[in-house]
């Protein structure tokens, strides 16, 4: 009997194992750790090339439709030297193209191979140029492009500054609030600014008030009360009109009517220009 009990006890573990009652812990398979490969570094993209300033000039020309307007200071305008803008008179101008920006240092450098400006910046207006310097620049530019770029006449300049056929009669070019449209002595810290950073006028032209004075192509002569068609006077004393005011000028300098004459040989760090294009 004792031997039978011992035999039964010895058989129990074997039976339990066979039936799965007794389970042995099986080690879980470990997950194989994968090492992430570092992402391949993308090659740095080259900086975009600056647009060719000569090609950009043509795309920046704005067509100014012809029309008739009153040129000169209105009767209620009263500022220093206003007598040079009297008498107001009727003028008719034909359509022409005018650059929406003042001529930049980048364009001058491209054409002339040098930069005469005192305050540097590729997208700033070129300055420290005389009327004679500008004529040499234009000759070289036209030889390079085969086009007929030129300075606007004084009548063309004022017609465009006033907004042409879209004019709303503003005192300054594009607004009666000078700070919206002009860089002048109260907001510049005596430095010109990149072109096109203020609000444009009704035609999409920038900086027609302020930033740098702009030479015109015709001669500076006293006004008369006579109506005129495309006036282009000869220089009475050799001077040429300057328009628009500058970063060192007062508010009245930036009025659309304000004008003065300058010698063709004289340059200054607030004298610049913008280009017109004949049709």
Show the residue positions of the predicted features.
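Extended beta-strand/loop cores of jelly-roll/beta-sandwich
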Residues: 5, 16-155, 239, 259-279
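Short active-site loop/helix that positions an aromatic residue
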Residues: 159-164
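A short, contiguous structural element within a folded domain that forms the immediate neighborhood
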Residues: 180-205
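Feature responds to low-complexity, polar/acidic, surface-exposed segments characteristic
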Residues: 117-121, 172, 225
């Amino acid at each position: 009997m004792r031997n039978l009990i011992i035999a039964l006890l010895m058989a129990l573990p074997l039976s339990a194992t066979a039936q799965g009652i007794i389970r042995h812990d099986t080690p879980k398979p470990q997950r194989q750790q994968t090492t992430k490969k570092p992402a391949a570094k993308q090659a740095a993209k080259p900086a975009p090339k600056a647009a060719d300033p000569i090609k950009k000039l043509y795309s920046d020309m704005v067509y100014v439709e012809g029309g008739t307007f009153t040129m000169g200071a209105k009767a209620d305008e009263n500022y220093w030297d206003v007598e040079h803008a009297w008498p107001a008179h009727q003028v008719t101008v034909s359509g022409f193209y005018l650059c929406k920006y003042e001529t930049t240092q980048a364009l001058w450098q491209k054409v002339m191979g040098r930069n005469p400006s005192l305050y540097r910046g590729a997208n700033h207006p070129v300055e420290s140029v005389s009327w004679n310097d500008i004529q040499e620049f234009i000759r070289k530019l036209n030889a390079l492009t085969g086009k007929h770029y030129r300075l606007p006449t004084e009548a063309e300049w004022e017609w465009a500054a006033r907004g042409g056929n879209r004019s709303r009669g503003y005192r300054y070019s594009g607004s009666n609030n000078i700070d919206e449209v002009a860089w002048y002595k109260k907001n510049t810290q005596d430095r010109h600014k990149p072109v096109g950073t203020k609000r444009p006028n009704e035609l999409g032209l920038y900086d027609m008030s302020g930033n740098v004075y702009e030479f015109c192509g015709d001669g500076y002569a006293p006004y008369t009360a006579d109506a005129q068609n495309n006036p282009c006077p000869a220089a009475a004393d050799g001077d040429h009109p300057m328009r628009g005011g500058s970063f060192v000028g007062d508010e009245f300098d930036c009025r659309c009517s304000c004008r003065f004459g300058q010698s063709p040989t004289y340059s200054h760090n607030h004298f610049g220009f913008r280009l017109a294009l004949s049709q």
